[in-house]
């Protein structure tokens, strides 16, 4: 994420959020926690990134992404079981096009059990 992302927002305290915090701990990123039902979430973030496995996305995450989409906040979905090179390239193009500095990362509690999450995160920077 060489594209000036400075802050990652994480909703709730769950295994996915903990994985992202661990990954970001040695990066030049600020981690902020917000409640997923926060009324002003669209004022806090510039975009949302939804991590998923094979398009398995919870209703709550779908609704939150929809709320941000209605507020003209760009969203990107990352299938951690997809091809790493293509997924990384698409994400980098999305970052370049939208130029977000504050992103909300969302993912299910089950994602950290998939070794592809760590593999993808380690290739982000």
Label the model's feature ranges:
Residues 2-102, 107-109, 113-121:
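Acidic/glycine-enriched connector segments
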